[in-house]
Amino acid sequence: MKKILVFFIFFQFFISLSQILFADIKINSKLSGCIHKLTKKDNLNFYNSKINKIEIDTHNYKDWTVNNIRIITNNSRFTPNHLKKRFDADIKVIYEDGNICYLKGRVRHSGDAKDHIALKGNSIIQSLDVTLSLGNIRGITRFKLFKPDVRGVLEDVVIQNHILRNFGYLAPRSIKVKARVNETQSIMLFQEKAAKELLEFNSRREGPILEADQKFFFELVKNIPDNNLSNWSVGTPILRTKSSKVMLSKLTNANLIYKGDIHEKISLDAINKLNSIFLYWSSRFQDEKNNFYFFDYDLDNSLLALFDKNKIIKLDIYNLFMQSTNSHHALGGSNRKFYWNSIENYFEPIAYDANPDISRNFSTTTTLKARYPFSIFYDEAIKKLNEELSNINTRKLKNDLSFLGIIMPEEAVKEKINKIKVNLDFINQNYNKVKNQDLALHNQYKYKENILEHFNKNLKEVDPKALLIKRNNSDLFKCEIYLKNCELFDISESDLIKLLEGELVIKNTNYQYVGQNLDLNALSQKGNYYSKKFLNSTIFYEKGIVLEADQIKNEIIINQKEVGARVYILNGNLIDTAIFFNGVETFANIEPQNYPIDIKGLTGCLSLINLEIENLKISATNSNCEDAVNVINSRGSIKKIFIGNSYSDGLDVDFSDLKIDEIEILNSVNDCADFSYGNYKLMNLKLNNCGDKGASLGETSTVEINNINVNDAKIGIATKDSSILNLKNAILINTDTCLAAYKKKQEFNGGFIEGKKVVCKNSFTKIKKDIYSKIIF
């Protein structure tokens, strides 16, 4: 009590003094937006603008400081949630090119452990969670500003995440920045949060993001005093190992369910699967042969990959890379984050809280030299990771790092990569010593019945009053532990979101969502798609599709027999292939099944995904999906696309790099052609009778159009959200607006159009743009 009183007396004086001393450097709260007008270069360098400094001034400075004092003086060694209140703030970003942006947002303290906050001289330095309400920073609106010492070696965090992204994994953009938070100047780690922006930057569609639900994780340690004793001395690892046995998963973006019934179904399916995987994990790390701490034992990659060999190897490589950078902390069950990739049917890891220290010979966040379980493909994964590390272009990596605030000579970059390889070799040696021992064989995946039994037994000890929510088709039931005394549970949509995000508490009682049919065998069920190999690609198709795939003719004919039935082609190469989709005619006022998406998250009647393509020909008629044709994450060239009579959009291309010689689209109820998140060279387009836009270009796309003819559309060509259009020849007839450029989403700039020859006939408006955009002739 005396300690708290001294702090409050000191800070009453400090608050008054600080308000005087940093009054001259405070951000003018009346300013908003950026001082530079949009240029083509701004959109070209949208994700790579160098940041000189980030400044944050909280409103209600006195209340903010008092809250921080309460965090510091709180008797627990962990920060309680009620002290993580949000405060309005002004944010200023100073870029190297001289641009200055004034943003608005809300900030709160971030971090569970007390190492996230400390006194620094006469001020406080702490980790922050920031949500922007106005503007973005390099396309990011939700981010963390970490104290420089809480995520491992700061430069290693930046290096690790950048390499992971180049290897095709999900990792947050991480930047070393100079920062000022109120009166405190410091170097900090800027890191985007796991959110929609992270997914789309990494060429993934928005979908469920999940993590470990820690509601019970701190239950047994929350009252341990904040003293000078170590966590080991007070028994924290032992207590948290016990509480981790009742740790399931939760959604971090449960608001997805607001988008519709199918989005809700996808989200519930994801959490159901991951709960089964967590239950298996928690029943395995301490069993008849195992006696591991929770942070030393990994989730089973066979389950996370839903038993797909290639995905298991990919996940093994991720685990090995984390271990090779001494980032074992990221592999502990309580620190795992995942994206449910509904198209490829597996849980993709999202790098989080890794604490890397590449130069060390051994990690400080594990007690073991070999982590169980090993998959049967572990040797193959080690070999592939070695190859990928050897193929890193260290000069390019050095240049990339400079945009992320890390200035490092190439020789030092090489040393980092070589040390990762040395660490990997050490891991391989330890693995070879134990891989044929009984313990390694014991920890290979084996089916386990009644995986809830272990959970119920431990929950009875950790939180005996907790209530479990199980699902039976569309109904929810509220049950006591062991799923006893269940009764129908009527819940509002807002409370359902709290439940799925692990935050539903009613009358001081924790509610835990467990799901439906928690049986590990359900993870291997194939779903409603059939599959057929075509050359080195795979065609997936639903019951309502009749498929003719002729590899000799290099031709795929798809006849749709049921409205809304879909087909998608995944991975591999399509060279000189012709694809014909013949849909079932439907009435415009009847909504098809699985609209606008299906359980895979697909919007196209025909979708082409993760393909290398050359001289492809596509014809699609009478589609009855959100998109007639959807091309995702594909590279190469298309000779011709013809689309006729689409229920909604005609062509939708996302996350791709394509040259298309000819596009002809007739009669789309919504847009004729959409292009987003990619680079597109379009030679000739003929778009007729488009219900909304002829061509829509968005989300950081760079598009070159040689010739385009649009007849009958609300907007001829729309360019938005940090996209660039180089338009050579256009004839736009019978439109409300010929050309439009605008900003639609907060995380982007406006659109930029550079036109040479544009003919605009029978249109109300030739040009329409907002203050964020530019059109030049």
Language model regions located:
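Extracellular beta-rich repeat passengers
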Residues: L504-F777
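Positively charged n-region of N-terminal signal peptides that target proteins for export
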Residues: M1-I4
